[in-house]
Structures are given as structure tokens and as C-alpha cells.
Amino acid sequence: LRFFTVYGPWGRPDMAMFLFTDAIYHNRPVKVFNHGKMERDFTFVDDIVKGVDTILKGSLDQRKEKGEFYKLYNIGYNKSIKLLDFIKEIELNLNKGAQKEMLPIQPGDVEKTWANVDALIRDYKYKPETAVAEGVKKYVSWYLDYYK
């Protein structure tokens, strides 16, 4: 299973969601790489959990009959979101503007990621559904409650 840019409550403090939210909340600059020309397939953690659960409940016997002892599935929202739009959602939910520190792209990074979930939909009738606006709202609500 390949997960794409997972975010949500209890996320790692070294990941973008926490770093951006915490910086904006505390009036610190947000480091924005590639001068904001980045896109990511942001996937809410609840969708990842549901995807893993759905796959684990799938029929092992059916896969064995097909000779499929392993298969690769992407779990992602199936849509790239501009990094600056993601930051705007955080700003909206915190009711604060971000101080953006525009930086060059980091070595080895890519400008865009996107999860093709066609196999997941075909084999398991599952597609992550949490839109970024909804997921960011849930995350910021959790953050404000947890760090009050």
C-alpha cells in the first residue's frame, strides 16, 4: 500500500500539516519550497485507515485464485492540490494569515504528486472522499483543542 501525503489529527510534528499550522498559529514564517509551485495529493488520515481496513477485509481466497499473492494499491485523494491553496485553508481555519518564506525546491523533491486510485476503485469499490477543506477544518479543530 502506498499512502499519499497523509495528514490529520495526531500527525507527526515534522510533517507539513503540523509545521504550517503551528507556524501560522504562533506568527512564525512558513517555509514554502519551490516558491509555492508545488502540488500534493493530500489524503486525510481517516481515508487511509478506511482504505487499509477495506483492503484487509478483501477476499484472500479470491486473490489466490487469480494468482495474486501481492498487489500494489495507491491510497490518496486522487487529486493534486496546490500547496498555496492548502496553506490558504489552514489560514482560513485559524483566521490568521501566514508569513510565507519562499524558498527554492529541496534537492530530490518533486513538484507534483498524485495518487492514481483506479485499481483501488476497481478491486475494492473504495475511493478516499475527504476534501482538503473538510480535512483541514477537522485538523485545525483538533490542533486548537489539543494545544490550548
Ranges and model annotations:
Residues 2, 15-16, 115, 127:
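Short, conserved clusters of charged catalytic residues that mark active-site
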Residues 22-148:
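C-terminal substrate-binding subdomain of Rossmann-fold SDR/epimerase-dehydratase oxidoreductases
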Residues 1-15, 39:
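Flexible, glycine-rich beta-alpha linker
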Residues 19:
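Conserved catalytic helix of short-chain dehydrogenase/reductases
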